[in-house]
């Protein structure tokens, strides 16, 4: 579960390394986000020469969580870290590469571009 002030690793090559969650989008008063949810975040660490800079406010979609997600068949999927991919307003990733595995739940959330760029879909 990702909430306000949560820090996440960035799983793409947009230039950001770490982001801090500002708000969870989707409904009024929503407190937590899970895999496939969109958040508003600020960039806390960035690499020089990247597409995004430190201090920018961006939208991101969560691709991995430590707490995991329950699937329809009753199984759970958990990852070793919390990670997100920075996206544009039209749900396309700002980077051109995705690092690490992503969850299959992104397919249901209409993030097909991220799923196709990912090296592994679990």
UniProtKB/Swiss-Prot annotation:
Keyword Ribonucleoprotein part of the UniProt annotation: yes
GO molecular function annotations of the record: large ribosomal subunit rRNA binding; structural constituent of ribosome
Record-linked InterPro entries: Ribosomal_uL14, Ribosomal_uL14_bac-type, Ribosomal_uL14_CS, Ribosomal_uL14_sf
Keyword Ribosomal protein in annotation: yes
Assigned protein family: Belongs to the universal ribosomal protein uL14 family.
Subunit-level organization: Part of the 50S ribosomal subunit. Forms a cluster with proteins L3 and L19. In the 70S ribosome, L14 and L19 interact and together make contacts with the 16S rRNA in bridges B5 and B8.
Organism of origin: Latilactobacillus sakei subsp. sakei (strain 23K) (Lactobacillus sakei subsp. sakei)
Entry keyword set: Ribonucleoprotein, Ribosomal protein, RNA-binding, rRNA-binding
SUPFAM superfamilies: Ribosomal protein L14
PROSITE patterns in the record: RIBOSOMAL_L14
Pfam family, one: Ribosomal_L14
Physiological role: Binds to 23S rRNA. Forms part of two intersubunit bridges in the 70S ribosome.
Gene3D superfamilies in the cross-refs: Ribosomal protein L14 (2.40.150.20)
CDD domains from the UniProt entry: Ribosomal_uL14
GO annotation, cellular component aspect: cytosolic large ribosomal subunit
GO biological process: translation
Protein name: Large ribosomal subunit protein uL14
């Amino acid at each position: 579960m990702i909430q306000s002030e949560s820090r996440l690793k960035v799983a793409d090559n947009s230039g950001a390394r770490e982001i801090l969650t500002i708000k969870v989008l989707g409904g009024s008063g929503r407190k937590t986000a899970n895999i496939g949810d969109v958040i508003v975040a600020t960039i806390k660490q960035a690499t020089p020469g990247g597409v995004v800079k430190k201090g920018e406010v961006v939208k991101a979609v969560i691709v991995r969580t430590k707490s995991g997600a329950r699937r329809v068949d009753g199984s759970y999927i958990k990852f070793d870290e919390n990670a997100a991919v920075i996206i544009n307003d039209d749900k396309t990733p700002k980077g051109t590469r995705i690092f690490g595995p992503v969850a299959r739940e992104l397919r249901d959330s209409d993030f097909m571009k991220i799923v196709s760029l990912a090296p592994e879909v679990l």
